[in-house]
From Swiss-Prot:
Source species taxonomy: Bacteria, Pseudomonadati, Pseudomonadota, Alphaproteobacteria, Hyphomicrobiales
InterPro entries, alphabetized: ExoRNase_PH_dom1, ExoRNase_PH_dom2, ExoRNase_PH_dom2_sf, PNPase/RNase_PH_dom_sf, Ribosomal_Su5_D2-typ_SF, RNase_PH, RNase_PH_bac-type, RNase_PH_CS
Name of the gene: rph
Chain positions recorded as phosphate binding sites: 86, 124-126
Name of this chain's protein: Ribonuclease PH
Pfam families according to UniProt: RNase_PH, RNase_PH_C
NCBIfam families xrefs: RNasePH
EC id: 2.7.7.56
Assembly with partners or alone: Homohexameric ring arranged as a trimer of dimers.
Species per Swiss-Prot/TrEMBL record: Sinorhizobium fredii (strain NBRC 101917 / NGR234)
Length: 239
C-alpha cells in the first residue's frame, strides 16, 4: 500500500494555473499534489555571446527552492555564494528538455529564460518543473506570436513532460511523493515528448540493483503517466 493510498499507476492530482505572474511573458503555477512550482518564461532580444550571428535562438533555465519549501528551512543558495550540484543538474535538465521540442532557428536570435521556483516540495520537483515550464514557454511564444514576432507552430514542435517512477515496497509505482522517494528501492525520472520520443531517463538503484523486467514496468508507467500529463497540457492551453 502506498502511503497516500494511491494505486500503483495513479498519479497525484495535477493542475496548471496559467498567467500566474502579470510581468512574465509566460507563466504557470504547476501543482503535482503537494509539490507546487512557479514557472516563468522571460523573453530577451539577444542570445549568449557564443551564439551571436548564428541565426538561431536559445532556451535556458534556472531552478531554485524557497527556503521553507521543505519541512525545515534551507539557506538560500545565494547566501552561500554558489549553487549546489543538484540545482545545476536540474536546471540543465529543464533547459535540455525544452530545447528538445523547440526549433531554435525559427525562434530567431532571441533567448527565452525559464525560471522554476519551488514554492512547496513533496517529491518530483524536477518533473513538475519540466511539465509546468512547457506551459510557460508555450504562453511566452503565444505572446510573441500576438506581436508578429514568430509563428508558434513553427517554433514549438511538440509537447514535453516528465514523471518520476520507482520501486517502492517491491512494487513499481508512478509519481513518487517525498515519503515514497525517500524509501524507494529504485528511483527514476523520465522525460518524453508528446509523440512518445525519449528525451532523458535518469535511474538509480538504492541498496540493490533493479532488473530489466522492473525497468520495463517503470517505463510503461512513465509512458502512460506522460501521456496523461500531455493531455492535461493540451487541455490547459486550449482554455
Amino acid at each position: 500500500m502506498r502511503p497516500s493510498g494511491r494505486k500503483t499507476d495513479q498519479m497525484r492530482k495535477v493542475s496548471f494555473e496559467r498567467n500566474f505572474s502579470k510581468h512574465a511573458e509566460g507563466s504557470c503555477l504547476v501543482r503535482f499534489g503537494d509539490t507546487h512550482v512557479l514557472c516563468t518564461a522571460s523573453l530577451e532580444d539577444k542570445v549568449p555571446a557564443w551564439l551571436r550571428n548564428g541565426g538561431k535562438g536559445w532556451i535556458t533555465a534556472e531552478y531554485g527552492m524557497l527556503p521553507r519549501a521543505t519541512g525545515e528551512r534551507m539557506r538560500r543558495e545565494a547566501s552561500t555564494g554558489k549553487q549546489s550540484g543538484r540545482t545545476q543538474e536540474i536546471q540543465r535538465l529543464i533547459g535540455r528538455s525544452l530545447r528538445a521540442v523547440v526549433d531554435l532557428p525559427a525562434l530567431g536570435e532571441r533567448q527565452i529564460s525559464i525560471d522554476c521556483d519551488v514554492i512547496q516540495a513533496d517529491g518530483g520537483t524536477r518533473t513538475a518543473s519540466i511539465t509546468g515550464a512547457w506551459i510557460a514557454l508555450h504562453d511566452c511564444l503565444k505572446w510573441m506570436e500576438a506581436r508578429n514576432m514568430i509563428k508558434v507552430e513553427r517554433v514549438l514542435k511538440d509537447h514535453v513532460a516528465a514523471i518520476s517512477c520507482g520501486i517502492f515496497a517491491n512494487q513499481a509505482v508512478v509519481d513518487l511523493d517525498y515519503l515514497e522517494d525517500s524509501a524507494a528501492e529504485t528511483d527514476a525520472n523520465f522525460v518524453m515528448t508528446g509523440s512518445g520520443g525519449l528525451v532523458e531517463i535518469q535511474g538509480t538503484a538504492e541498496g540493490k540493483p533493479f532488473s530489466e523486467e522492473e525497468f520495463a514496468s517503470l517505463m510503461q508507467l512513465a509512458k502512460d503517466g506522460i501521456a496523461e500529463l500531455v493531455a492535461l497540457q493540451k487541455q490547459a492551453v486550449a482554455g
